[in-house]
C-alpha cells in the first residue's frame, strides 16, 4: 500500500516556456531576451532543478550554454554553470551525439519519465513544445508554467502543440517588470495536490 507521503515524494515534471500574448513560444526569438530580474529568476530556477528532459530542437538551442563566450557577463557565466551542472535526458531518434552530462533516449519515454520521477526529488523541467505535447498525451506533466511576455509574434510554435489538456490556474506571479508567470495543473490533479491552497 502506498502512503500519501510516498506519493508526494515523487519528483514533479514541469513544462515552462516564455510565451507571447498570442500564444507562441519560439525560444530563440529576440523579443524573449530576458531583462536582468527575469534572467536572475531563471538562474535560480535552473539551480533548483533535479534534471531536465529535452526534445532535439530545444536541446540544440540550449547547447549554446555548453561553451563560454567572450561577450558574457557574470550572470551569463552563472547561468551556464547552473545549466551544465544539471543532468539532462535528450529524447531523439536522429541525434547521434550529445554534450556532457546528458543521456540520449530514443524510445520508451513513458518508462523514462516514470523512472526519473521515482528516482529524483524536487522538480524536473521538460523543454520543447513537441516533447511536452507527447508528455501531455501520456499524462506525465504535473505543472505548466507560462512566462507571459508583452509581445505579439503573429506566428510561430504554440505552447500547446499537441493535446489540449483540461487545466486549472493554481498560481500567478509578476516576474520582473512586465512578465507574468501563470502556473496551471491538470484539472484532475488539483483537488488532491492543491487542496490546501484554497483553505
Predicted regions and their residues:
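Enzymes that bind and transform nitrogen-containing heteroaromatic metabolites
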Residues: 2-199
Amino acid at each position: 500500500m502506498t502512503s500519501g507521503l510516498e506519493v508526494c515524494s515523487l519528483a514533479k515534471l514541469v513544462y515552462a516556456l516564455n510565451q507571447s500574448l498570442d500564444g507562441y513560444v519560439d525560444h530563440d526569438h529576440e523579443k524573449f531576451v530576458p531583462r536582468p530580474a527575469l534572467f536572475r529568476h531563471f538562474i535560480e530556477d535552473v539551480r533548483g532543478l533535479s534534471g531536465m528532459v529535452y526534445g532535439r530542437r530545444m536541446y540544440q538551442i540550449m547547447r549554446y550554454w555548453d561553451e563560454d563566450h567572450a561577450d558574457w557577463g557574470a550572470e551569463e557565466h552563472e547561468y551556464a554553470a547552473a545549466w551544465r551542472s544539471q543532468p539532462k535526458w535528450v529524447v531523439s531518434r536522429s541525434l547521434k551525439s550529445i554534450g556532457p552530462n546528458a543521456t540520449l533516449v530514443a524510445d520508451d519515454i513513458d518508462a523514462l519519465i516514470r523512472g526519473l520521477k521515482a528516482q529524483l526529488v524536487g522538480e524536473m523541467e521538460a523543454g520543447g513544445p513537441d516533447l511536452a505535447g507527447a508528455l501531455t498525451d501520456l499524462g506525465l506533466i504535473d505543472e505548466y508554467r507560462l512566462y507571459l511576455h508583452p509581445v505579439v509574434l503573429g506566428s510561430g510554435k504554440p505552447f500547446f502543440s499537441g493535446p489540449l489538456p483540461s487545466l486549472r490556474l493554481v498560481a500567478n506571479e509578476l516576474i520582473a517588470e512586465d512578465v507574468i508567470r501563470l502556473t496551471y495543473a491538470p484539472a484532475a490533479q488539483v483537488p488532491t495536490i492543491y487542496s490546501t491552497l484554497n483553505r
